[in-house]
Amino acid sequence: EMCIRDSGFNDNRRYGLKEAVHIIDGLKSQGFSVMLGVPTQWRALEGDTESDPRLHELIRKCDIMMPWFVGRYNETTYPKYQKLVEEDIQWAKKNQVDYAPLVFPGFSWGNLKGKDHNSFIPRNKGSFLWTQLTGAIRAGAEMIYVAMFDEIDEGTAIFKCAQKVPVGKSTFVPIEEGVESDHYLKLVGEAAKILRKEKAIAYNTKLNPAG
């Protein structure tokens, strides 16, 4: 499987739908399945999306689609996007494309751009991520794209993180107090069990649902 990221955005990127079609057609001709990353508002062709209906044709060429949600909402504003996911899934099923909604644990520009550009979405000790995971599953998702395993630049990493900074003064931010170093990996693992029908979905956002 190959993933082609960020097609259809309206921010004047150096590539467009024409280039994406060429790449996807080439991959499909060689037997690859293709996942296409698209903007949040891909279905309505508004907001972060260019108003070109050819994007929908491009999506139909692919096996899986994944809308980019990082930075679009926080735990308070998420419910509107859960409804968006539900409607996206209906479109995807009608058009015979698999749909992988994106979830992310939190966000910060602090590492990449410095404190002066520190747009921040709190993790809330995993509550934000768990709300998205269970929300996507309730909306009908059969697969989920987690952003990201090791993305430090935008503060979305879910990998194990120390609870104490092992050096002197540093911009490194340790994992939140009161959670284990692999807390976010556990949350994702629990969601995977639910997707595989190995356990029922938990109707709450308590920490460490495995506990």
Which residues make up each language-model segment?
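Glycan-processing catalytic domains of CAZymes
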Residues: E1, R5-G211
